Amino acid sequence: MSLTERIGQTPKAYELANERGPFSVEVYLNPGTSNTYQYVATTRNKFNNTDYDDLPWNYTSGKKVVTATGVVSGGERYVFLLRSEIAQDIQVTMYNTNGGSNPLNNSNVTRSNVDSSSYYQQPPQVVYNNGDLYGSRTGYSGAELGASIDKGIASLWGYLKQPLVMVGIAAVVGYLIYRYYYMSRPIGFGSSGAYDVPLLDTPLLRDSYRLPQSFTRDPLFRNSV
C-alpha cells in the first residue's frame, strides 16, 4: 500500500515502528519531480520537541530506497520525516523487512501468507507536527479535519452570498412566512377549519368578516345561533 502526498517545507513524518523491539523498514520514495527533497529517521519524541532544522537531514532527488533500522524502547516510536523546499508530490511505500520465522509486527504489520522471509508491507501512517496521527485509510487528522470544515464553510458562504442566490433565499423565506401567517389562521367563526384571513389583524378587517346587523336582529337568526 502506497501513500502519495504533497510534501512541502513543513515536515511530514511517517511512523516506522510503535512497539518495543528491533525493527527494519525499507522506505521507497518516488517523487513526481526532479526537485531535491530531504529525509531523516528519528524518534517521535525528537520530532515533537526539536527544531526541525536541528535534525540530521539527508538531501536527495529522484527515486530512493532508504533502509531504516533501530530498536524501539518502551513508550517510544520511530518516524521517517520528509520535507521539500519546493512543494512536490512524493509516493511513499513502506515494507517491514524483519526476517525469521516470527517477524516482528511493528507498525501494525500483518504477516505474509506466502513465506516468512518475504516482505511485509505496512500502510504508511503520517504524524503531523501537532502530534496527530492518522492512517492512509482513516481520513484526516484533527487539525486537517478542522481546516477542511473551515474550507467547506467558506466555500458554502461564498456560494450563498451571490446576489441571485440571496434573492432566491429571500423569496423562499418570504413565501414560507406568507404561508404561515396568511394561510394558517381560521376566519372569525370558531374553529371551522376555514383558513383564509389577511395577515394584518386590525379591527377594520375583523369587522369586515362580521355579518350585517340586520341579520343579527332577525329572530330566526338569533334562534338558529
UniProtKB/Swiss-Prot annotation:
Compartments, record wording: Membrane
Segments traversing the membrane: 156-178
Any one Gene Ontology cellular component term annotated for this protein: membrane
Annotated membrane topology: Single-pass membrane protein
Location (main, coarse): membrane
Record keywords, A-Z: Glycoprotein, Membrane, Transmembrane, Transmembrane helix
Annotated family: Belongs to the ascovirus HvAv ORF58 family.
Glycosylation sites noted in the Swiss-Prot or TrEMBL record: 48, 58, 105, 108
Protein name (record): Uncharacterized protein ORF58
Highest taxon above the source species: Viruses
